[in-house]
Structure formats: C-alpha cells, structure tokens
C-alpha cells in the first residue's frame, strides 16, 4: 500500500486562508447591517433603496412635497410618500425643520418614524397645523436649540394621547421654547421629565 504524505504546512495555510475568508465575509455582513441601521452613513441625499428601502431626503424635498399637498417625492419612477403609513423617507440628514407644516390644516399623517437626530430647529414646525395629532414621542431632539412656536395653534395636537416624557434629557440644548404650545388647546400630556437646562425663553409657552 502506497504511503500518502500530507504537506502539513500547505494544509495549515489552506485552513488559515479559509478561516480568514470566513471572518472577512462575516465582518462584511455585520458592517453592512450596521450601515443599514444608520442611513446617514450608507448613502447621499437623493439615494433611494439603500437603507431599508427608504429615500434619503433633504429639506427642499420635504418642502416641495408639502407645498403641493401630495406629501410625495418621486425618484426613479417610485413614489416615496409620508402621506400614508409607508414610512419610506429618511430625514436623518436634515438640520432645519422650521415651518415645514406651518398652516397645513389638512395634514395628520404618521411621521413618528422620522429621524431628527441632526435637527437644530423645530421652530414653528406645526404652527397652525390644526388637524395634526400624531405620536412623535420617539423623536430625539438632542441637538435642537429652537422649539419656539412649534405647536402654536395646533388645536388638535395631544401627541395621539401618548406621553412626551421620552424627550426627557434630549431637551437639554433647547434655548427657545416661547409660545411652544400657545393655543394648542387639546394638549394635556406629561412633560415632567424634560430637562431644558439651557433654555433662555419660555414666555407664553402654554
């Protein structure tokens, strides 16, 4: 019987290479998942479908869709809307949400999934939006400095009967809250956990 000799060095190299390839592909999968969970790192404004099927939008995209009451942005033949429960626009790159729904008396759609983590201004965002009453307690306004007039005269707003306490310490950078809920006659939620330690103006807040 012929003796079979095994090149142990070559075998070890092959096994090592195989294991390294496996580790590489596993790392690639983990990295891609992490990126998919953080849309701001996976694409640019206008990219579609790269993050959980959402369209990455900027302020102008939102303004145009709101202005014509379609609440829809078209990209590559696909309609991305926040006028229903599709949840398919990503807002995490937007810093300025000022006046977006000001005076929009017909808007009451679920935008609680919006990412406002980079926002610095929510000033007058729902000012006079008399129909709006959606739950936005999952928002994290940790960089927001201006919430003045945010819900002024938003007469239906009560956060869909959900607490806004989760904003808690995320309000610590807010400087302006004047007239924030002025004329928001339905609002009656607990905000006792808020920590606006840097606030400068709170006059006529309610």
Predicted regions: what is each one?
Residues 24, 30-206:
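Negatively charged
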Residues 16-25:
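Sec-dependent signal peptide recognition
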Residues 1-16:
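N-terminal secretory signal peptides that target proteins for export/translocation
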């Amino acid at each position: 019987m012929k003796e079979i000799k095994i090149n142990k060095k070559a075998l070890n190299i092959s096994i090592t290479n195989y294991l390294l390839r496996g580790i590489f592909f596993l790392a690639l999968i983990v990295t891609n998942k992490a990126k998919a969970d953080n849309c701001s790192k996976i694409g640019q404004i206008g990219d579609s479908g790269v993050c959980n099927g959402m369209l990455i939008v900027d302020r102008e995209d939102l303004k145009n869709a709101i202005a014509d009451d379609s609440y829809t942005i078209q990209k590559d033949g696909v309609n991305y809307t926040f006028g229903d429960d599709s949840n398919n626009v990503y807002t995490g790159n937007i810093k300025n949400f000022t006046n977006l729904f000001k005076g929009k008396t017909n808007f009451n759609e679920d935008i609680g999934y919006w990412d406002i983590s980079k926002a610095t201004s929510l000033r007058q965002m729902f000012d006079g939006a008399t129909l709006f009453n959606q739950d936005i307690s999952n928002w994290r306004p940790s960089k927001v400095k201006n919430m003045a007039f945010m819900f002024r005269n938003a007469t239906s707003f009560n956060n869909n009967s959900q607490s806004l306490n989760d904003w808690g310490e995320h309000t610590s950078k807010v400087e302006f809250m004047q007239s924030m809920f002025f004329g928001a006659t339905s609002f009656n939620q607990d905000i006792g956990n808020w920590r606006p330690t840097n606030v400068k103006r709170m006059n006529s807040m309610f």
